[in-house]
Amino acid sequence: MKALSKLKAEEGIWMTDVPVPELGHNDLLIKIRKTAICGTDVHIYNWDEWSQKTIPVPMVVGHEYVGEVVGIGQEVKGFMIGDRVSGEGHITCGHCRNCRGGRTHLCRNTIGVGVNRPGCFAEYLVIPAFNAFKIPDNISDDLASIFDPFGNAVHTALSFDLVGEDVLVSGAGPIGIMAAAVAKHVGARNVVITDVNEYRLELARKMGITRAVNVAKENLNDVMAELGMTEGFDVGLEMPGAPPAFRTMLDTMNHGGRIAMLGIPPSDMSIDWTKVIFKGLFIKGIYGREMFETWYKMAALIQSGLDLSPIITHRFSIDDFQKGFDAMRSGQSGKVILSWD
């Protein structure tokens, strides 16, 4: 079968021919319809420091997808041939304390699809049936293919009660924009998103965010005054792991504010800890998606009218995958979808 693989320890992704994966007793075989390119896939393409430490070569990459069940392991129940599914990209052990205690997303033995085991940039994918999520009929393939990153956004945004709150989102990448849209959809008062990339800030404006602020051109304190905010932001969603953005967030949070951190900052990032302490801030680290509460919330949000369609900006055939990676690497894109049909 055709697959996109990391073949060499250097920049690039290559189209390859690999065997169809074998179906285990507890697995599903999925025929891939559409995949989306994640920022993680771009890191792997660029072969940065994280990729060099993490990715075994060769490796079929990718973890954002929608497809059709074409094979069912003999121990599997609850699925039928033809079911349309996406799936949780974190394969968990099932026997550690967190898994057994119902906190599966915190499994200490997590293995990543397309990172530590073969991924979805292929005609077929095998995953444990436990990880598969049936897609409702009224959700399109395009939207289903981005459920993985949408789940990061939903997990981050819904970490705290947002109704009537003022929310600051740092970083207008696709996940940041989706998180901001979720916050607005569920009842936040003001949702402000910051970045220096005007293309992506314009995407945020199309999603109905209260204010999309280019911090290279506007002062965030002036924006807060314009919105009638006198005490700071109640909730902060930190998406890019950018030290200057996080410091600005600490400066503008209200006392008792809550921050959810999805972004991964440099290990040597310095901040003014007195602001965390004297403001009584609560900081929560976010990893992946809650299994599987986040997945049900994703479907419900879309079914209740949340429109994510503007975030999908580019679509290519899998044979034009290079154009897709070029678009993602340019910074002038939202989500990029590759069709395998």
Swiss-Prot record:
The EC category is oxidoreductase
Q: Which UniProt keywords apply?
A: Cytoplasm, Metal-binding, NAD, Oxidoreductase, Zinc
One GO molecular-function entry: zinc ion binding
Cofactor(s) it depends on = Zn(2+)
Q: Write down the SUPFAM superfamilies for this protein, in alphabetical order.
A: GroES-like (SSF50129), NAD(P)-binding Rossmann-fold domains (SSF51735)
Give the cofactor binding note: Binds 2 Zn(2+) ions per subunit.
- Known EC number: 1.1.1.103
The metabolic or biological pathway listed in the UniProt record of this protein is: Amino-acid degradation; L-threonine degradation via oxydo-reductase pathway; glycine from L-threonine: step 1/2
Family matches, as SMART domains:
PKS_ER (SM00829)
Q: What is its main location?
A: cytoplasm
Binding partners and assembly: Homotetramer.
Summarize the protein's role.
Catalyzes the NAD(+)-dependent oxidation of L-threonine to 2-amino-3-ketobutyrate.
Name used for this protein in its record: L-threonine 3-dehydrogenase
Protein source organism: Escherichia coli O139:H28 (strain E24377A / ETEC)
Per the UniProt record, the lineage of the source organism begins with: Bacteria, Pseudomonadati, Pseudomonadota, Gammaproteobacteria, Enterobacterales
